[in-house]
Amino acid sequence: MKVLISPKDEFEAKAAVNGGADIIDVKNPDEGSLGANFPWIIRQVRNLVPQSIEVSATIGDFPHLPGSASLAALGAAVSGSNYVKVGLKGSKTLEEAFFLMHHVTRAVKEYDLNTKVVLAGYADYHRAETLDPFLLPEVARSAGCDVVMVDTFIKDGKRLFDFMDDACCKRFIDKGHEKDLEVALAGSIKLQDIPILKRTGADIIGIRGAACSHGDRLAGAIQAENVRALMDLAKQS
């Protein structure tokens, strides 16, 4: 299981690398759950991070604007991301979801076939008024994505496990694996959640808050020692 740590700038990225993170995921928490950062921040992080470590970038909790999403996704890929992550916020039907993600995938793959596209849905989909995440593995497969992910949209202290217990997470992972997708889980994950997440069979877990000082995803900053504690537990056999 890989651990993805989400810095907002090159200083936090350096701390994440020093802590041993598997994937460095550039985001802007001030713009939401999957808030997008600036292209030059992605480039700075890619230049800082050793080539052996993959870089991811979020492009936002996206409304149903397929053209805008495609252009943003291409921008993230050109800026050096190995993964381009799209929060499927505004697409209200399976047809809309497929249309947006198909064009995102086309934009990214025409630039670089090796860049992975991540379709991210929300465990708190009733609150976010988005699609049920269990519908998304099929959308991701049909649209040519590489990874399907579930996160939480509203960051109010509620966690992934408040909306999906470990058995539910495992069912989501199994659905993704049946479609030959990698599966990622995120959503205010704490240190004590890691052993449970390992048992679900997740390929990737995404963390920001637990890696930050005082556990604060907005006011805190990622600390190498916090990342190291997360990594040590994640890599225990």
Q: What is the predicted role of each segment?
A:
Residues 2-22:
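N-terminal basic/disordered segments at the start of proteins
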Residues 16, 148, 197, 230:
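Conserved, mostly hydrophobic/aromatic
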